[in-house]
Each structure stands twice: as structure tokens, then as C-alpha cells.
């Protein structure tokens, strides 16, 4: 697990370019405190690297790494879990190795098979691959977006890096040019999906894509792998067949991702996914596995009780830390520093703390991310499925019908979402921090912008299976990369590697074969994972209601974070200038504090944007103080 950066120029590398790449490399020292490296061809390309040593702790893993003849050079961030199998195949083809690192396997694979090698990688990665002879640079990102890759482009130069601040803080970037469409997307969702960047001429390599560019050229983005999203009904796994297959796949993935030359631990919540991963990790370990939990002072979100019960059942070495409302102000600077792009998921707070807790004991952990998206774990899956039939009616009939059901008990009424024009509109609303009425009040100039929300296309109700597969495809393409972004930024801020075995490609491909009936049972999701976990811990220890890994942000915005809201949002013109109505902001905040509206996510999206801009939208000169 590391950090990468690079620059490709049209008119020849200068000393200023090399110095800038060195400064951009220093920005990510937390991603790689163990080693750094630099390489350039003296003509068009310069690369930088910071290393967090996990496999082959000696100099054999030093990067940037080149083939013996210098024909191929790579910088690689991540872990390749099938590197031993690929290495054996490459050795049979005549390739020779100098080290035991997975990076050298990546390098030799690209040299041997070209871009086709990317489809053979099972791992988490973001890489840059340069060939001096052709001066072509290729960037690539793993199929699920576990590792990040940002970029900035102009006709004269191209910059890429593991952190968005690297591509917006170099001397050529125009930091005053905000893309209004991307700003709208961020304020609505709290993150930027797909390949979007907040500033003009910036972006991300989307999951499962590669980007090709030559000096003076235009980036070409091509998909190389798509996660499977479903199989024909006759090929589906149900009942005990699904249970046995998932059990075996998860076990194999956890063990495959346990290869490490340093001590490994686990994040442990009170839910299902991380306890399952922790249980399997402990089963394969020689001694107690370090497991890390964050509790809160809010009984609704606190998971420390169930997590402690799991720890006792599994026999792990349990470490618990609590987060209080008073911690919010103290953590704001860390939240700003770790999120090098605008990011509005406030579960960054506990994720930062659990990463700090773990980093005091280990260099790498496994987590349970991905279970909700793959196995229909979110409550919204069941709600939308159960309301599907309503969307065969005209909207006027749905609105009238919903009104007539109001006297009924809550459990017998349809979800309020049946009044939306389409299922897609409802699903988008469920992901939104700010909605149309909020934009009209807070940011009128953004209210009528066309939304680039193809991920939330508006489907017809279709069959139940069609709807469920559409929802899962949206979660994998949009929501999951946001979750992974949060974990990567928070963990790497504390120089901690996080592996996600539930997103091992073998598990992902198997999940596409599991019928929804094995997951959605009695109004709750992930039943197949629940049953898998019940083979490892007493079933009575598995909680029924799903809780999120979160904090009581609604109240924090009214109390502990009120001074920050006042100073950053209400007492000045917010960033970016010219988009926001300060009177509308004040009125919206007053409505939130009074309880007339719940604008928790929208207000935090706005506040997080201000914190990010203050921290990261400035010239490179201040970087040394930030990484000290």
C-alpha cells in the first residue's frame, strides 16, 4: 500500500517539473512513510512514489520499478493477491525476477501481456505504467475502485496522483475554475461519482478503467473490466447451495488476502460483515488477532456492545475506543487533512479514529466493506422492492392512494417514495443530501443545471429481479466507491493498509450468482452472510437490526459543530464564490436547528466543502507544514 504521482509534459522536462514532482511526492508521506523513490526519462515523464512496506520489506519492493532493459516502468499502489500464481506463469514464459514483491509481478505482467494483464489481476490497485520508447503513459484502477487515481490535464502537461490535492495544487492548475455540474453532483451526493473532478480539467480514473495518454495528447479512457451484475435464473444459487458456496468463497478470500510480512488485524463492528471477516481471520491465525472497534455516546449508533460480545466469542485481542460529541471539533483538522478531495460522508469521523487505533498496533487490517452492496444488505433494497407494484399505477393514483393509507399502522403503509415520478427518482432521493427545493433556496444558480446522474437512470418497474439487479448495479458503481474512498483516505492518513476480502473478485463473481431470495428474507438483507456467520458464532449474538457505522451528526451540527457552521458557512461567502445565497443558508440552518427540517447530510456536505477548500486549495508552498 503506497502513494504514486507522476507528470507527463509536451515540451520537455525542466528542473521546475522535477522539483514539483518531488514536492507532490512529499504531500503523500502518510501514505508511505517507509520509503520514497523518483524516476524520470529526462525527456517527458517523471514519477514519484511513497511506500508503506507490507510484502518484501527490503529494497526489492522499491519503486518506481523498471525492467532490466528499461522498456517498462511502473508505480503501483495496492496489493495483488494472485501474484504468486501469475509469477509462476511468467517464470514458465521465461521472465526472471529479482525480488519477492507483488509489484515486480505487476511490472513483468504488463511487459509480457500488455494491457490484457489488467484483466488477470485479482487485487486492489491503482497504477501508472510508462514506456519510454513510445512515451505512452497508462493509468489503471481496480474494477471496484478500492484504490484511488486522480488526474489533471492540459495540452502542455498531464499530472496524476493517489490524492486529488496533488493534481490541483501544482503550478499549472487553475484552482478558481469550478465545474458547476460537478459542484451540483457533490452537493447532492456528498461525493463525486465516476470520473468526475470538482475543478475543470480534473477527474478520476473510474473503477475498472484505464487511461492512455501521450505528451500533448488528450486522455483516452477505456473500460477493461466490469463487475458481474447477475446471471440467468437457471444458473442462480439458492438455499444451502448458496450458503455453502458463499462460506467457502469468503473463507478462501480472507486467507488469500492474509499474505503479509507484517502483523495483521481487523476492524470489528457490531454487524455481520466485519465479524464474519474477523472470525475467518482468527480461525486461520496462530494467536489472538488484534480487532479494533469504535463506540459512541449515542445509543442509536453505538455498536460497542455487540462488537465486544463478538470479540469474546471469537477470542480476539480486542481494542475499543469511544468517540464523543466534544471530539468533533478536535477531529475537524484531521478530517480536512485526510480527505484530499471534497467528501461529505461523516462516518469519516469514526473511520479516522478506528484507523488511528489500529495503526498503533498493526500496519494492515481486513474490513467487511462490500457486503451490503453485494448481498442486498441496505434497508432501501427491501423498501423499493416491496413498493414496486405501486409504480405500475399513474403517479396521481399513487399520490391519492398513499394519502388514503395514512390512517393505517406504519408497517401496513407503503413507503413515502411511491409518490416520486419513477423508482429511479426515489432511489436518487434516498442518496441525496440536498434536493431540488434545497438548491432553489441555498444555491439558486445550480437549481436548474442538467444532472449527470446516468448511474441513477430512471427504470420502469419491470420484474422484481430486474429492479433488484438494477439497484445493486447502482450501488456497486456509485455508492461502493464512495465507501471505499472514505476507508482509504482515513486509513492511509494513519499509514494503515485496509484489505477488503468481501470484494475479492472471486466473491464478487459468486455474489452475482446468488439469488436475491437467499439474501432478502423477512424484511432484512444479507441473510446468506448472516447464516455464514452463524456457523462461527452463537446465532443469538448476531443482532437483527442493521446499524450504520456513523455518528450523531444531526445533533453535532446544532451543538458541538455550530461554531464551525457559523464561521465557515454563515459569516462569510462560502466557496466557491458566487454560487450560494447566504440568507437561504441561514434560513436552512435555522430550520435544521429548530427541527422543522433534517438537513444533516446537506449541511455537512456544505461544511465539508469549506473545510476542504481552506485546507487544500492553496499553492504547494505550504506542504511541508502539513506532513510534518
Residue positions per predicted region:
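Cysteine-centered catalytic environments shared across enzyme families
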Residues: 1-339, 351, 355, 535, ...
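Residues that scaffold the ATP/ADP-binding catalytic core of kinase and kinase-like folds
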Residues: 89, 170, 374-377, 510
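Short secondary-structure boundary/capping segments
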Residues: 335-337, 379-386, 623-624
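Acidic-residue sensor for enzyme active/binding pockets
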Residues: 79, 102-104, 303, 369, ...
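Active-site proximal helix-loop segment of RNase H-like, two-metal nucleases, encompassing DDE(D)
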Residues: 339-342, 569
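Active-site adenylate/phosphate-handling loop in enzymes that bind or generate adenylated species
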Residues: 143, 353-411, 484, 490-507
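Adenosyl-5′-phosphate
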Residues: 1, 23, 116, 174-175, ...
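Compositionally biased, low-complexity linear motifs
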Residues: 45-47, 157-161, 383-392, 514-524
